[in-house]
From Swiss-Prot:
This is Putative 2-hydroxyacid dehydrogenase SAB2178. SUPFAM superfamilies: Formate/glycerate dehydrogenase catalytic domain-like, NAD(P)-binding Rossmann-fold domains. Its EC number is 1.1.1.-. It comes from Staphylococcus aureus (strain bovine RF122 / ET3-1). Belongs to the D-isomer specific 2-hydroxyacid dehydrogenase family. NAD(+) binds at residues 155-156, 234-236, 260, 283-286. GO terms for molecular function: NAD binding; oxidoreductase activity, acting on the CH-OH group of donors, NAD or NADP as acceptor. PANTHER family: D-ISOMER SPECIFIC 2-HYDROXYACID DEHYDROGENASE FAMILY PROTEIN (AFU_ORTHOLOGUE AFUA_6G10090). Signal peptide: none annotated.
Amino acid sequence: MEKVYVAGAIPEVGLKLLQEHFEVEMYEGKGLVDKDTLIKGVKNATALISLLSTNVDKDVIDAGKDLKIIANYGAGFNNIDIEYAREKSIDVTNTPKASTNATADLTIGLVLAIARRIVEGDQLSRTTGFDGWAPLFFRGREVSGKTIGIIGLGEIGSAVARRARAFDMDVLYTGPNRKEEKEREIGAKYVDLDTLLKNADFITINAAYNPKMHHLIDTEQFKMMKSTAYLINASRGPIVHEQALVQALKDNEIEGAALDVYEFEPDITDDLKSLNNVVLTPHIGNATFEARDMMSKIVANAAISAVQGEKPQFVVN
């Protein structure tokens, strides 16, 4: 029986599928798998199930001389050297569609949380308390009738747009390509990035990360935004220059931010933690039972397909 190395615990539904077809070796230590353990694990393995936090570089790929597939448990795959994997004739797959609804739900949840100061209100209620209802007390912003600007109208961005329309929001979007069919379906308008930044009340980042996207939102971009704007990032941390965001918040260039991802993840800068006009969540975009189970099945089936000589779904290289 061929071996699969699983770089961290995954939901049981996928693990059982793997156990039917492979000898399964899984990292069960505390924290993230370290490089030496990963290199040891991929030796003699036909398949590797990697997590978003698993750095699969050339050394790891070279150690996995028998690898046919690296099935990444996540929609992103910038943790893997996919070009080198291609050179070695190793398929790399991801789990794109499984994350769509969960991440879109969280994105809209972050919009509501920061606009209506939900987390801040929860903290107040649990600590000092409040004196009662008052006309000027704890005011936030309404979402209905506002403009949402979506950076990246892929599967997740489109799902965010549909949810935003249910709140009677106007939808702007930007990206490398105009998507006229989706515009008609959703009721969205394509604009360039600068126009989006200048006009949106809520700016959500739902684009995939690549080197060209690094620090797409920096000091110059914050200066374009409305002083009442909110930035929401449930995509990848390095798309936003974190220190520039901190400065924009401190200088009241924008009203607030809600983040599920961070530039130096898992580290979160103390400056962000100290600000009241920021909502922070620990990279839980697709952390639902439904999404994580589906992702588990997708990576398992991809590994099974590869060892059976079939082309797996969702190959990215």
